Amino acid sequence: MNKDKLRNIAIIAHVDHGKTTLVDKLLQQSGTLDRKNMTTERIMDSNDQERERGITILAKNTAINWKDHRINIVDTPGHADFGGEVERVLSMVDSVLLLVDAVDGPMPQTRFVTQKAFEKGLNPIVVINKVDRPEARPHWVLDQVFDLFDNLGATDEQLDFTVIYASALNGFAGHEPDELADDMTPLLDMITKKVAAPDVDESAPFSCLLYTSDAADEVDRG
């Protein structure tokens, strides 16, 4: 695939702000994963502890084909106990989706990871999630996010961030909290528009950063 059609992003958020649910919906609505063929919820939580606790411990990756682009997504831990796993993948992406709860706003872990992203020169797309909750206060949360970025020493470019409002559970997103589309198209389109393509030298010798590996307990000897 043409590298100009690639988008590499990481999703960072505090625990329980809806990160894994958002990835589930993006996979389903893009056609990458058909709901009727799913055997389990929480697609990106692959081990038993993650499913039981409802959190992401190890960095996972998946890819979405959207229109003529391929979006590579790394779903990183949002729990403070696994913060090192978050930092590990930030050097492998070109932008981040900062997912923030529409009631709680930015949390301490959000601050830590966002600072690491800024230090690496990454520009965020802010997704304010759960705007369908009765107690949601998205405009207050947006102000809190801006103040956080400013306090972290964000550049003018990083402060000029794009905001998407969403209800990941229901699969809706939009540019205003009271004007959501019927699906996640606004978010997917914004990723392809705002996230830069990888900056690589295609004439250089092959090199890569490995961020996921796995092993099979059994192999086919037939």
Q: Which residues does each predicted region cover?
A:
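P-loop NTPase switch module centered on the Walker A-proximal segment
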Residues: 1-100, 104-106, 113-114, 144
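Short glycine-/polar-rich loops that comprise or flank the Walker A/P-loop
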Residues: 93-95, 120-124, 159-161
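Conserved phosphate-binding elements of NTP-dependent enzyme cores
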Residues: 97, 117, 167
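Conserved C-terminal guanine-recognition region of P-loop GTPase G domains, centered on the G4
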Residues: 102-155
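Canonical P-loop GTPase G-domain recognition
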Residues: 135-192
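Glycine/charge-rich, flexible interdomain linkers and switch-proximal surface loops
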Residues: 202-210
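Conserved small/polar residues in nucleotide/adenosyl-binding loops
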Residues: 211-218
